[in-house]
């Protein structure tokens, strides 16, 4: 049963054209997730178009127009099972989607696979650096690096070329804080060293990609942290009373607990808890629950309030410091800009009070202190003041409540995380 194995979200990152989609296609194919007839059909189609080496990549690039252009755009979720884990692959094609999804936590990755091409003239490139730095900044806890396209080195499967690229990867990852990262030679296209050791790489004594994936650590469920449950909705049920609904992000809720909702500042007792219409005595991280609270009226709570223990209330802020990435803004952002911040289930207009500095996406160093404005592509530290009471936590303490998206003009213009705060 898939559901009994721990679940892992895996994000595939790296420079464009270094073989991410081919690797994903290969993994799915090897795990029997793609029927042979589809592979045959793709192969025939690719050959007709003169792209004989694209068969596995085409599994991911399944839209006609993408195939014509040879580009992956859709963010695709694919699943496969190993002996140990149930993986969901978050293919990260469009840089922008990737950053937005990673930051807002819609696809919080438990691990990343960094794909670097071994082909001459490729190796570690601009986007490789940027993706690695973002993975670190956004709290991806573990990383596997793969040196792909080993079949395309001169001569093929060159140990010398592997070592050159391996050194480049180590130089990139060590300063930004990724330690003990396995760096594995393979070929996504030919299938070398994916599931089993390859005679073409007889010099390689380390793990296959599969062994490295199985060696990843299970993401810890944050049960030891204080309870935090962002409210999605509130109902009043005849004969029962007020029933808030939401997903527990951290901690545990038990029947009988004294809880408080912030910023509403309303306290009550948990009388009952239900999940999927089944009563339960306690619920934990990841559980979507409805719970009845005594002592609070329906109209006293709303979406965006956060429930926590009465003796450890969720943090209401007067202002906070954030690291943001500008994803898509038509002009520039200056101090005084007031878009809507989407934090957990809350949506609150916030003013960017001050742009403290911009940051180099390759290594995290300061580019410019107090710039007048920031634009698409910039990473910056900013000071933010919400228009009304807002619960947000430091990403270092409650990552699930510290990430946000910034929306304006009907689109996500930036995303970020709270790195420091001033309590209200």
Curated annotation (Swiss-Prot):
Residues passing through the membrane, by range: none
Name of the molecule in the record: Elongation factor 1-alpha
Statement: the UniProt record of this protein carries the keyword Protein biosynthesis: yes
Top EC class for this record: hydrolase
Source organism, top-level taxon: Archaea
Positions of Mg(2+) binding: 21
Family assignment from sequence similarity: Belongs to the TRAFAC class translation factor GTPase superfamily. Classic translation factor GTPase family. EF-Tu/EF-1A subfamily.
Region (G4): 148-151
Reaction catalyzed: GTP + H2O = GDP + phosphate + H(+)
Subcellular location: Cytoplasm
A GO molecular function held by the record: GTP binding
Domain (tr-type G) ranges: 5-223
Region G5: start-end pairs: 187-189
Function in brief: GTP hydrolase that promotes the GTP-dependent binding of aminoacyl-tRNA to the A-site of ribosomes during protein biosynthesis.
Annotated source species: Picrophilus torridus (strain ATCC 700027 / DSM 9790 / JCM 10055 / NBRC 100828 / KAW 2/3)
Gene: tuf
Residues binding GTP, per UniProt: 14-21, 91-95, 148-151
Region annotation (G3) ranges: 91-94
